[in-house]
Design a protein with these regions (language model features):
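Acidic-basic catalytic patches of nuclease active cores, encompassing PD-(D/E)XK
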Residues: 1-24, 38
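Conserved catalytic cores of phosphodiester-cleaving nucleases, focusing on short active-site segments
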Residues: 33-35, 41-51
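Charged phosphate-binding loop/patch that engages nucleotide di/tri-phosphates or the phosphate backbone
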Residues: 97-120
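Beta-rich catalytic cores
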Residues: 29
Length: 129
C-alpha cells in the first residue's frame, strides 16, 4: 500500500511524537495515525499519496474530519520525494473537491513546528488552533 512508505517517513522524520498506526478496517473513516506528546496530547493524521490532481477520500474519511475538525491533520505526498504537505483536517471537503491547496506546512521541519508548537515563549501556530 502506498501509504506504508509515507508512514515510514513519518516515523523517521517526527520521532518526538509517539505514533500508533490505526487499523482502518476496524472503524471506517478513522485516520491512519494517532499521535501523542505529553505537552500537546492526542491528534490524528490521515496519510494520502497523491497520484492525480485531486486527493481521494472516502465518504467516511470526509465525515470523520468534518465531525472532528480540531487536532486532525492530513499528510499528503506525491511521488516526488520532497513533496510532503500538511493540511488541516477541517479542509477535507475542499481537498476532496478541488485538490491540493495552500498547505499549512510543506517540509518535515514545518510539519514538526505545526504539530508541536514551541512550548516556551511562542504562541501556538495558527494551524494547530
Amino acid at each position: 500500500k502506498p501509504e506504508s512508505k509515507v508512514w515510514q517517513e513519518v516515523k523517521k522524520n517526527l520521532p518526538e511524537i509517539t505514533w500508533t498506526r490505526l487499523e482502518s478496517w476496524a472503524s471506517l473513516g478513522v485516520p491512519d495515525l494517532l499521535g501523542y506528546t505529553d505537552s500537546h496530547g492526542f491528534f490524528t493524521v490521515e496519510l494520502k499519496v497523491i497520484s492525480s490532481k485531486k486527493i481521494k477520500f472516502s465518504p467516511h474519511q470526509i465525515s470523520f474530519h468534518v465531525t472532528h475538525p480540531h487536532r486532525s491533520f492530513i499528510i499528503a505526498k506525491t511521488l516526488d520525494p520532497r513533496s510532503i504537505k500538511l493540511y488541516s483536517g477541517s479542509s477535507v471537503q475542499e481537498l476532496a473537491a478541488c485538490g491540493p491547496t495552500l498547505p499549512l506546512a510543506a517540509s518535515w521541519s514545518e510539519i514538526r513546528d505545526c504539530l508541536l508548537p514551541a512550548a516556551c515563549c511562542l504562541p501556538p501556530v495558527a494551524c494547530c488552533l
